[in-house]
Amino acid sequence: MKLGIHAYAWCSEWNNTQLDLIDRAQRLGMEFIEIPLMVLDKFDADAVSGRLRSLGFDACTSTVLLDDTDITSGDPAIRKNGVRYLKDCVKATADIRASNFSGVIYSKHIRQLDGKPTEREYAWSADSLREVADYAEGLGVNIGIEPVNRYETFLVNTCEQAIMLKKMIDRDNIRIHLDTYHMNIEEKSFYDATILAGKDLMHYHLCENDRGIPGTGLVDWDDIFKALAEIKYTGYAALESFVDCTGNMNTWVWRQLAPDGDTLVSEGTRFIRSMMKKYGL
C-alpha cells in the first residue's frame, strides 16, 4: 500500500506557491501527494510535473463538481460543460504523469433535493462518466468514484452505490475511492464496505471521524486494515484532514484539529504505518 497526504493538510487552494508542499510531503516520509484540481486555471502542470520528476515523487489528483459542471443537471449545456471539465482534469492528471483521478465527480458537491435521486439522474451521470472514461483510457488514467456523506451528495453515499454506478458506466478504468470519514457516517461496517470494493478499490482516504489525526478518534482501524489485508490492497491511501480553516473550502471545520499540517502528517503516519505493519501491508 502506498501512503500519501492530501495537499489540504497545509493549504486551502492549489497554485504554484504550493509547489514546496511536494518537497515537504517527501521529507515527512510520504510516497505521494494528492493534488486538488478545483481551480484548473491555477494548476501549472509543467511546474508540478517538473517538481515531481526532480524528486522522483508520485502524485494523484481529485476534484468535486460545482453548479456549472454538474453532470446530473437537467440542463444539457451544464452536463456538457461538466464532461469538458472532467476531461480537462484527466488531461492535467496525465500531464503530471499521474494515473489516478477521483473525487465527487458524479454530481454537484452539495446539492439539495426535494426527493430521492431519480433513474434519469443516475443515467445522466453514468453517460457523462462513460465519455470521460473513454477519454481517460487513452491517457492511461483511472477514475475513482468517491462515495461521500448525505450532507455532501445525494447520489453516491455508500460503496454499494458506487459499484452500482460503476456497473452502469461499464468501463474498466472506473474504480472505487473510499473515505473513512464518510464511511463512518454512511456504512454499516468499514470491513464490509472495503471487502465489497475489493479489486475495484483504487484509492483510500484515511481520516478520523472528526477529520483529526488518525488513531485519535472513533474509527475502527482494525476493521479497516483487516479488510485491506484480506483484499491484498497495494493501491494509494492518503491522509486527508483539513488543518488550514481560513480558505475557500467547504470542509465545515471550525476549529484546529491538529497543531499544524506537519504534526498531522507525522503523528498520523506513525499510527497508520503501525497498522500497516500489524496487518502485513
Regions found by a protein language model. Name each.
Residues 32, 144, 176-180, 238-239:
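Generic enzyme active-site microenvironment
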Residues 9-11, 37-39, 65-68, 105-109, ...:
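Active-site-proximal loop/turn and secondary-structure-junction residues that shape catalytic pockets
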Residues 31, 35-126, 234, 238-248, ...:
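Structural motif corresponding to the early beta-alpha repeats
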Residues 26, 53, 94, 137, ...:
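Anion (oxyanion) recognition and catalysis
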Residues 77-175, 258-264, 270, 279:
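Active-site acidic/histidine proton-transfer and metal-coordination neighborhood
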Residues 1-7, 11, 15-27, 97-99, ...:
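Histidine-acidic metal/acid-base catalytic patches
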